[in-house]
Amino acid sequence: MGVNLSGRSFIKLLDFSTEEIEYLLALSKNFKDMKRAGVPHRYLEGKNIVLLFQKTSTRTRCSFEVGGMDLGMGVTYLDPGSSQMGKKESIENTARVLGRMYDGIEFRGFAQEDVEDLAANAGVPVWNGLTDLWHPTQMLADILTVQENFNYDIKGKTLVFMGDAKNNVARSLMVVCSKLGMNFVACGPKECMPADDVIDACKPIAVENGCTITLTEDPKEACTGAHVIYTDVWVSMGEPDSVWTERIKELTPYRVTTELMALADPSAIFLHCLPAFHDTNTTIGADIAGKFGVTEMEVEDAVFESKQSKVFDEAENRMHTIKAIMYATLK
């Protein structure tokens, strides 16, 4: 029997089988091919979706908006000041209202419980555009990019996450690698390792799919022979300078450098979910340089701008993979 995701919400990848994830990736490739060939694919004409954003975004918002319009749907965007959710109206009641008006709901915010409450009460598919715990839509874009660079043969390849390996991206990468048979390495200081509950959930999945999960504090050991080296920002915006001071001190040894990339497999690629602090050409980058004397944070500019860097392919793939998720769950 073929994969059927119609009516399903997309909350975290632990909810999906290997076959279902592979189906979404294949569908993403098909949509990318159609987009590039200029083939119309307004398969969801007449449907409408709403995007609920507690956190700002470039890639997630644009991917849902362009992807939705490519599929023929109407798209409504609500920022924190445009809805009553969580203020004058509970999340449960917001879900019940929006579920009467829209065919699908995207949520990007803080608490995982919020997106789960939406999904439990909306009566329509709900898609997790990011929470503090998980970033599942990012994962499909990441893996599609890996597939494209390794001839769609990714089983047995090794992905290394460098830096704050307890964050939502690293947690999600551990899950998707385990589901798809890729070896996952978390490399960072001991206090920045993934939570035990995530490791415990992923270990049996990794065994089933013939891959490994490794935790190490040694960057050279982690990167030697790796096929994908991935990193993310060290601190969330808005946190006090004291947090920046501490994080820069503890995570600087885990900056992705040309020296570390040279230890990786000759075919290795660099990934980052963006935005990245690789220079001083942003207000925040300049501010960090002024306060802390650091001109590059989680990745050297030379790596970010190198041929090994596939970050903009990865960013484009957000649109194609999100389109696949919407189509598969709404068709």
Model-found features: residue ranges?
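Short, conserved loop/helix-junction motifs that constitute active-site signature segments
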Residues: 154, 178, 259-267, 306
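Glycine-rich phosphate/diphosphate-binding loop of Rossmann-like nucleotide-binding domains
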Residues: 54-66, 151-232, 237-239
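Structural alpha-helical scaffold elements that stabilize or flank donor/cofactor-binding regions
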Residues: 98, 118, 221-222, 303
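Phosphate/diphosphate ligand-binding glycine-rich loop within oxidoreductases
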Residues: 36, 42-147, 278
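C-terminal helix-to-coil terminal segments
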Residues: 284-331
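Rossmann-like adenosine-cofactor binding region
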Residues: 204-301
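Positively charged, low-complexity intrinsically disordered leader regions
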Residues: 1-62, 66
